[in-house]
Amino acid sequence: NRFIFDLHGFTLKDANHKVKEIILSCVKRNCKEILFITGKGIHSNTEKDVYISKDLSKLKFSVPEFIKSDLDLSKHILSINSAEKSDGGDGAIIIKLKNL
Protein backbone atom coordinates (compact mmCIF):
# COMPACT_ATOMS: atom_id res chain seq x y z
CA ASN A 1 0.00 0.00 0.00
CA ARG A 2 1.14 3.50 -0.85
CA PHE A 3 0.80 6.78 1.05
CA ILE A 4 0.86 9.98 -1.05
CA PHE A 5 1.68 13.47 0.26
CA ASP A 6 2.17 16.77 -1.59
CA LEU A 7 4.95 18.99 -0.19
CA HIS A 8 4.27 21.95 -2.50
CA GLY A 9 4.39 25.21 -0.56
CA PHE A 10 6.34 23.82 2.41
CA THR A 11 9.57 25.48 3.56
CA LEU A 12 12.59 23.17 3.82
CA LYS A 13 12.28 23.05 7.61
CA ASP A 14 8.55 22.37 7.57
CA ALA A 15 8.90 19.79 4.78
CA ASN A 16 11.59 17.89 6.68
CA HIS A 17 9.45 17.88 9.83
CA LYS A 18 6.42 16.62 7.89
CA VAL A 19 8.47 13.98 6.03
CA LYS A 20 9.77 12.59 9.33
CA GLU A 21 6.26 12.55 10.82
CA ILE A 22 4.84 10.75 7.77
CA ILE A 23 7.61 8.16 7.49
CA LEU A 24 7.40 7.21 11.17
CA SER A 25 3.60 7.04 10.96
CA CYS A 26 3.78 4.86 7.84
CA VAL A 27 6.25 2.53 9.55
CA LYS A 28 3.78 2.04 12.42
CA ARG A 29 0.95 1.36 9.94
CA ASN A 30 3.05 -1.07 7.86
CA CYS A 31 2.93 1.04 4.70
CA LYS A 32 5.29 -0.26 2.03
CA GLU A 33 5.75 2.89 -0.06
CA ILE A 34 5.43 6.67 0.19
CA LEU A 35 5.11 9.04 -2.76
CA PHE A 36 6.24 12.56 -1.84
CA ILE A 37 5.35 15.18 -4.44
CA THR A 38 8.16 17.72 -4.14
CA GLY A 39 7.79 19.72 -7.31
CA LYS A 40 10.71 20.36 -9.62
CA GLY A 41 11.98 23.46 -7.82
CA ILE A 42 11.22 25.75 -10.74
CA HIS A 43 9.41 28.29 -8.56
CA SER A 44 11.66 27.99 -5.50
CA ASN A 45 12.20 31.36 -3.78
CA THR A 46 15.21 30.22 -1.77
CA GLU A 47 17.63 30.66 -4.68
CA LYS A 48 17.73 34.33 -3.66
CA ASP A 49 19.41 33.32 -0.37
CA VAL A 50 23.15 33.10 -1.06
CA TYR A 51 23.66 31.06 2.13
CA ILE A 52 21.59 28.12 0.86
CA SER A 53 23.01 25.65 -1.64
CA LYS A 54 21.20 25.99 -4.95
CA ASP A 55 20.44 22.25 -5.14
CA LEU A 56 19.56 21.70 -1.48
CA SER A 57 17.25 24.73 -1.52
CA LYS A 58 14.86 22.58 -3.52
CA LEU A 59 12.77 19.92 -1.86
CA LYS A 60 13.47 17.32 -4.53
CA PHE A 61 17.13 17.36 -3.46
CA SER A 62 16.90 18.23 0.22
CA VAL A 63 14.23 15.71 1.26
CA PRO A 64 16.25 12.60 0.24
CA GLU A 65 19.38 14.06 1.88
CA PHE A 66 17.45 14.80 5.07
CA ILE A 67 16.10 11.22 5.18
CA LYS A 68 19.55 9.70 4.60
CA SER A 69 21.12 11.86 7.32
CA ASP A 70 18.46 11.15 9.98
CA LEU A 71 19.22 7.83 11.70
CA ASP A 72 15.65 7.48 13.02
CA LEU A 73 14.44 7.55 9.42
CA SER A 74 17.22 5.94 7.41
CA LYS A 75 17.00 2.67 9.34
CA HIS A 76 13.47 2.20 7.95
CA ILE A 77 14.30 3.04 4.32
CA LEU A 78 14.83 0.39 1.67
CA SER A 79 15.22 2.85 -1.24
CA ILE A 80 14.69 6.45 -2.35
CA ASN A 81 14.16 7.07 -6.06
CA SER A 82 12.65 9.55 -8.48
CA ALA A 83 9.09 8.63 -9.30
CA GLU A 84 8.02 7.14 -12.61
CA LYS A 85 6.77 9.72 -15.10
CA SER A 86 3.16 8.63 -14.45
CA ASP A 87 3.65 9.40 -10.72
CA GLY A 88 5.26 12.82 -11.18
CA GLY A 89 8.69 11.99 -12.57
CA ASP A 90 11.37 14.44 -11.45
CA GLY A 91 8.81 16.30 -9.34
CA ALA A 92 8.23 13.39 -6.96
CA ILE A 93 10.15 10.79 -5.00
CA ILE A 94 9.24 7.24 -4.05
CA ILE A 95 10.33 5.98 -0.65
CA LYS A 96 10.21 2.21 -0.16
CA LEU A 97 10.12 1.12 3.46
CA LYS A 98 11.79 -1.96 4.93
CA ASN A 99 9.65 -4.75 6.32
CA LEU A 100 10.42 -4.85 10.02
Regions found by a protein language model. Give the residues of each.
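Long, charged, low-complexity intrinsically disordered regions
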Residues: 1-33, 40-100
